[in-house]
Amino acid sequence: MKIKNIILLGLVLFVVSAVNAQDIISVAELSKISKNSDVIVVYAGAEDDFKVHITGAVSVPHTSLCNDTPVRGLIKPTAEMAKILGSAGISSDKTIVVYDEGSGKYAGRMYWILKYLGAENVKMLDGNLTAWKSGRKPVTGAPTKVVAATFTAKPQAGYLAKMDEVKTAIGNSAYVLVDARTPEEFAGKAETELRKGHIPGAVNINYETVLDPKGMLKTNAELKTLFESKGVTSDKTVIAFCETSVRAGIVFLALKGLGYSKVKVYDGAYLEWQATSSNKVE
C-alpha cells in the first residue's frame, strides 16, 4: 500500500509540473495525496483562523518564523526557524503544501521562507482554503496530532536580498525592483505611519494582480505578459518586496514558476528601507 501511495504521489506531482511550471497544486490533486505520509499540509495564516482547517493540516503562522525587532517581520535565525518547523512535524524532505485563508499572501510568504531554508518540494494550494471548501473537501475543527520531526535547513542565499544589494540595484539595468504593495501605497497616497512613497526606480506589481478573481494563480501566459509589461524580464535579477515582504512571496513563486532564475525577496522590505533616514524615497 505504501509503495502504491508513493507511486500515486509521484504521478500527481509529475502531472502538476507538466501542466504548470509553478509550484502550485490543485484541490483535486491535493485531495488524492493529502493522507500520504510523505506529504504535510501547512496552514500559514493566523492561529485564530485555524479553527476550521484542512483535515490533517498543521498550523505554523508565518509570523511565528519572524521577529518584531529590530525590523518587524524579518525572519528569525535559521536554527530557530528549523526548530519551530520541526516541532510542527515538518521535515525538509517531505512534500510540503502550504495554504492560507484565501488571500494567498500568507501562503506565499511561507512558500518563500521554506524555499529559502532549502526545502525542495514545496507547493502552494491553488485558491487556498476558499477553493478547498468550494470543492467540498474535508475540513475539521479538531486539532491535528503532531509528531515532531527534524527540519534540516540549508539556507539558499540566492533567494534573499539585503539592503546593500537593493542600493546596488537602484539605477542598475541588470536589476529590477518589484514593489508588491497596492498602487495607493506605492504612490504614497495610503494612510500610513511610514514615509510615503517607494524605493527609487521600483515598479509596482500589486500581488493581487498575479491572481484571478477567484484567488487562483493566473496562467503562465498571463503572468508573462503582466511581468514583461513592467520591464520584469528573465535576464534581470528581480528583487521583490512590499511593506514587510509578506505579499512579495507569491510574486516570488509566480516568477520562479515562469523560469526566472534570479529572483530574490528583500526581507527587510519597505519598512526597513524607509526607516533608514539616509535612504531616499520617491
Locate the predicted segments by residue.
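Intrinsic disorder/low-complexity signature
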Residues: 2, 17-20
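Bacterial N-terminal signal peptides that target proteins for export
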Residues: 1-8
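Bacterial N-terminal signal peptides
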Residues: 8-17
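Cytosolic catalytic domains that perform sulfur/thiol-centered chemistry
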Residues: 19-282
